[in-house]
Each structure stands twice: as structure tokens, then as C-alpha cells.
Amino acid sequence: MKSLNRNVKEVSFNVVDQKWIIRVVDSHDPHMVVDGAVCRGCTWVGQSEIYMSNELTERTFKRVLLHELVHAWLFATQMSVPDAFNEEQLCDFFAIYSEKILDLANKIEQRFFSNEDNSSI
């Protein structure tokens, strides 16, 4: 199992033509605490930022990253209204964006777990 490249602190990327930044931070960073609970990942849609804990294994990192990227995509596509989001919309969202989200997650994971220092995708 690979470990995080400590030289890479953040990676920038685009979601539907919106610039986003993902940062790996200490698990007790203020951005990682929501309603008093420490999170493994957190998406701040107003700032177009995703924060990930530096204590995650590669496998857990990928799962949490995918979860947070879905939040970003929902916000960027304006589909993030929970009361109005039904099963058909969920299936459409998955059909339209799942390959793009997975492809981006793979690229981000490679940046954080390789020896490359490039911080942009």
C-alpha cells in the first residue's frame, strides 16, 4: 500500500468549468470539523475546496475522495437540492457524470500518492 506524498499539499482541478482545490490537512484542522465531529473529508462548496485527512490509507482516501467529488459535482451542476432530488435524477446524474468523477479521482489519487510534485490536473 502506498503512502501519501508529503510534498504534495494541494491539487487544483476543474469541475464543470469551475476551479476547485483539494487539500490534504491534519485531521483536526478546523476545516475538517463539522458540527463538532471530525470528518475524514469535507467539501466547502462556497469556497470550491475539498479537505482530506492526512491520516487516510490509500484505499480509504479513494473512497472518501469519490464521496467528496460527488458533493462538488452536485454543487457545480446545481443538483444539490436534497428535497427535490429523486431516484431518477440520481440515476441520470450517475449516468452522466460517474465516468468523469472516477477519472478525476484516479488522477487526483495519483498526484497525492506518487512522487510527482505537480499540483494541477
Regions found by a protein language model. Name each.
Residues M1-R59, A76-I121:
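Metalloprotease/metallohydrolase-associated module, dominated by Zn2+-dependent proteases
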Residues R63-F75:
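Active-site recognition of the HExxH zinc-binding catalytic motif
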